[in-house]
């Protein structure tokens, strides 16, 4: 069974690497929905082979629903 993980991010440069290292132990498909970070969040995610999408943040529920609707799993 393939497990996909969705992570919502915004300026998570300080935390995302450790999070991704943990998740790679359980999933090869990590999807990032970023809210136009201004730090190195995207670069770190690219280095860790994540699929990256950007969407304007309104709230957590809408951001997650946007991902579920627009991303192919």
Residue ranges and their predicted role:
Residues 17, 39-48:
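Acidic helix N-cap motif at the loop->helix transition within catalytic regions
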Residues 53-61:
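Short, acidic/glycine-rich phosphate-metal binding loop used to engage nucleotide
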Residues 1-25:
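N-proximal low-complexity "stem/linker" segments adjacent to membrane-targeting elements
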Residues 22, 34-42:
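A conserved acidic beta->alpha catalytic loop
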Residues 3, 50-51:
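Short, conserved active-site loop motifs that form the nucleotide-linked donor/cofactor pocket
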Residues 26, 48-49:
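Short, structured coil segments at secondary-structure junctions
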Residues 46, 62-73:
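Active-site nucleotide-sugar/metal-binding loop of Leloir-type enzymes
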